[in-house]
């Protein structure tokens, strides 16, 4: 398995990461660029971005940690967001590896709990996340909020 690149330690990957996440999630390029720029320039824990590249240096997986993933509970923060693994790299443990890496990295920064919204409930429960509550997105639709302790 390829190793995880922490964007704050690998700023040369910023533009590639911006384009890759935009392609996967259709969030505006500028929103990703701003968040990743803050990640690279800032010494604070949030936001953070993580990427995985294959042997040809193509991005194949990644995730971020932001204050709020477009829901109505700003008190449930920070949020893991945008976890994605390219189809041909799935079922190899990469997503679980990224999630555990994030839990360790954020734990080392003093963050105790992480949150995320998802409809992939079985996967996250198998990864040690637990259902916390329902939240609502910007359009008012209910979403399941999960939480997990970091590794400190």
Model-derived regions: residue spans:
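A short beta-loop-alpha structural element at the N-terminal edge
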Residues: 1-17
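Active-site rim helix/loop that mediates acceptor-substrate recognition in acyltransferases
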Residues: 26-51
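Short hydrophobic/aromatic beta-strand or adjacent loop that forms the aromatic wall/cage
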Residues: 47, 140-146
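Conserved beta-strand in the GNAT
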Residues: 51, 58-68, 79, 84
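Residue-level detector of beta-strand face positions
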Residues: 51-52, 115
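Helix-adjacent hinge/juxtasegments
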Residues: 69-77, 81-82, 92-94
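Conserved acetyl-CoA-binding loop-helix of GNAT-fold acetyltransferases
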Residues: 82-85, 91-104
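Conserved active-site alpha-helix within GNAT-family acetyltransferase domains
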Residues: 108, 112, 118-142
């Amino acid at each position: 398995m390829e190793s995880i690149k922490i964007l704050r330690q690998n700023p040369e990957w910023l533009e590639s990461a911006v384009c890759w996440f935009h392609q996967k999630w259709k969030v505006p390029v500028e929103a990703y660029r701003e968040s990743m720029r803050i990640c690279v320039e800032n010494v604070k824990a949030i936001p953070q971005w993580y990427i995985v590249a294959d042997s040809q240096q193509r991005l194949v997986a990644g995730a971020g940690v932001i204050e709020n993933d477009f829901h109505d509970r700003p008190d449930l923060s920070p949020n893991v967001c945008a976890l994605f693994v390219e189809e041909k790299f799935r079922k190899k443990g990469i997503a679980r590896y990224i999630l555990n890496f994030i839990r360790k990295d954020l734990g080392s920064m003093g963050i105790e709990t992480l949150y995320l919204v998802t409809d992939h409930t079985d996967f996250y429960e198998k990864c040690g996340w637990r259902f916390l509550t329902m939240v609502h997105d910007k359009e008012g639709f209910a979403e399941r909020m999960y939480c997990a302790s970091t590794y400190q």
